[in-house]
Amino acid sequence: MRDWQTFPDLQKKKVSRDHLNCPATMAGSNVLWPILLAVVLLQISVAFVSGAASGGVVLSDVNNMLRDAKVVTSEKPVVHSKQETEAPESSVELLRFVDDDEDSEDISSIERQDGRTMESKKMADQVRLLTKQLNALMLRRREDYEMLEHNLRKSLRLTTNANSVDADMRSELNQLREELAALRSSQSGNKERLTVEWLQQTISEIRKQLVDLQRTASNVAQDVQQRSSTFEDLATIRSDYQQLKLDLAAQRERQQQTEVYVQELREEMLQQEQDFQHALVKLQQRTRKDGSSASVEEESGSQEANQEQTGLETTADHKRRHCRFQSEQIHQLQLAQRNLRRQVNGLRFHHIDERVRSIEVEQHRIANANFNLSSQIASLDKLHTSMLELLEDVEGLQTKMDKSIPELRHEISKLEFANAQITSEQSLIREEGTNAARSLQAMAVSVSVLQEEREGMRKLSANVDQLRTNVDRLQSLVNDEMKNKLTHLNKPHKRPHHQNVQAQMPQDDSPIDSVLAETLVSELENVETQYEAIINKLPHDCSEVHTQTDGLHLIAPAGQRHPLMTHCTADGWTTVQRRFDGSADFNRSWADYAQGFGAPGGEFWIGNEQLHHLTLDNCSRLQVQMQDIYDNVWVAEYKRFYISSRADGYRLHIAEYSGNASDALNYQQGMQFSAIDDDRDISQTHCAANYEGGWWFSHCQHANLNGRYNLGLTWFDAARNEWIAVKSSRMLVKRLPAVECQANASASGAFVSVSGSAADAAPSSGATTTTTTATAAPATVTTPKTNNSVVQFVAAGQA
């Protein structure tokens, strides 16, 4: 707020307030009223100009000013009433100085009328001047309105330019989308790197533009602050105007009071004049009465007349002295009034001239400031509109970028995931290549051995064929000889000779047959022992495979007479199940699940029979690795894992759970394996048929990793009471250390002994049957068995 130092006219007004309180200066206040009216009109014009630029802020202030003016005018009758109530007291005080002279009152009234006529003429001139100034202000306001219209048209043109900028931004966004589509379709790393660098550059440029926008916004904020300071200056001017208005109202009140006082003095003087005339009339009547009765009562009333005459003379002297004193006081008052009037006129004209000059200077200054403010406000409005449009465009671009950035991140994450998959597949392919090379080397060795064995088998088969031909030839000879012998036996003289020949023939043929059979059996046993030696040299599981990387390896589980190709990890885990893309069909029969299916490098099931032999001694643990559709990794590990035999339905046995996934397999503890053609669950529905996959079902969906892909791969999370939607899964088996195996064997010795005896009984019975059949028919039974095992080994090596 500005103080009184910045407004010298107002300071003079404040200083001369004591002079204006005088009744003589009240007449000059009538001249100030049109000047203050001009100031009000000027303030209203400034308010209109500033309101055209700044909205309705200043208009509200103008409304407040008009409301205050209404309040002041409404309060005026109350002031008059107060003055009327207070007037009698002041009139009583002024009666002391009233004179009975009519001439002085007439002179003062004539002078007042002359002063009023002069003041009315000056007021008319001032009103004309104010009308001219108002006309000039109206012309300026019209020019300002035309300027505002021009600025609005420019702002509309800027909005059209903003539409073109918006079209450019849309075209750039379309280009970004096309490049994003190209980036999605392309697979080369250089293009992706270049697009990512381009995106980084564009984002950095956008950030720089945002910094520039922030700077311009700060500049605009400074301009707005300056504008607010100008508004504060206008508020100070407005407050000064309010103060002037209050001073004007006070001067009006004082003027009205003086007018009331003068009117009361007039009335009192008239009343005194009437009283004086009545007193003269009474004196004349009394003198007449005294003249008529003077002759009669001259002598008697001479003394009384003398007394009355002396009393009248004393009263007349007193009145003369009082009138003389009043006339002297009135003359002094008139002189003082004339001096005061001269001083007031001089001060008034001087003050009015100074005030008019100051008002004109202030008017010119306000007009210049108004013009500057209007131009600045117009430029600020342009800048504000352009900034708003630019901010809207930037916000739109930012929202679009915010919407496109997650898509880009999603696409980049997809590309990274695809790249990771490709790298993992490449590593797997490399591992598979190295493993294939190793397996090829092993197979080359085994094939060379098999070729040698095949040569031996060919020789053996040739020998067998030769033996068969010899046996057939001998059999035909024996038959012919027997026929001849029978014919000779029919003859009596040749019977003794036939008996001698028949006695010699078995002795000659039996050594040949026995030698051939023994050589054939020995060669076949040699081939079988070599095959079993090759099988025994293979590792029983992946814990015996010493490798530094994950890959495919040949293993031979305990009790199995043919090798098995499976995936092994570097830390000795054997992969028994894998799901990740739904490429393999897991809706298979119970026999297929028992034998196993799929490719070890992709989706596959190792087979329930192989699981039984891998976990036969109850010394294995199971680890289930899962990844849900939100890329969360879940692990469930069981320290004890065992699958029973085929006769028991491959029953599930687990214990000692750990991991971040829930113990969902515990709901299926002790359940037999179910498939689409063999329902062994305890549910009323066919779980394997409904969810299209074999599993150890109890009540269907507590855990199922062999169901239909994207439909039936689930794992129940008891902590959250919801199912995990599994995207990929892997089941791994590993043998426990020897110490833990002994502890588990001692803890479950009975169960292991029973299962072990059953498992041992089956091979022993098979061995006995094999030996008996081999001894009974060595040439027809043993050879096909050996050939089948060799064929199985060769097929496994080729796989």
Swiss-Prot record:
Chain spans, region Disordered: 287-316, 489-509
Keyword Disulfide bond: yes
Secretion signal, residue range per the UniProt entry: 1-51
Disulphide-bridged cysteine pairs: 542-568, 687-700
Gene3D superfamilies: Gamma Fibrinogen, chain A, domain 1 (3.90.215.10)
The record's account of how the chain is modified after translation: Possesses five pairs of dibasic residues that may be the target of proteolytic processing.
Positions of glycan attachment: 372, 587, 618, 660, 744, 787
CDD domains assigned to the protein according to its UniProt record, in alphabetical order: FReD (cd00087)
Subcellular location: Late endosome
Family annotation (Pfam families): Fibrinogen_C
Single Gene Ontology BP annotation: response to alcohol
Compositionally biased tracts (Basic residues): 489-498
Keyword Signal included in the entry's annotation: yes
Highest taxon above the source species: Eukaryota
Annotated GO CC locations: collagen-containing extracellular matrix; extracellular space; late endosome
Function statement: Involved in regulation of neurogenesis. May encode a lateral inhibitor of R8 differentiation. In conjunction with Gp150, promotes Notch activation in response to Delta by regulating acquisition of insensitivity to Delta in a subset of cells.
The protein's name in its UniProt record: Protein scabrous
Organism: Drosophila melanogaster
Lineage: Eukaryota, Metazoa, Ecdysozoa, Arthropoda, Hexapoda
Gene (name only): sca
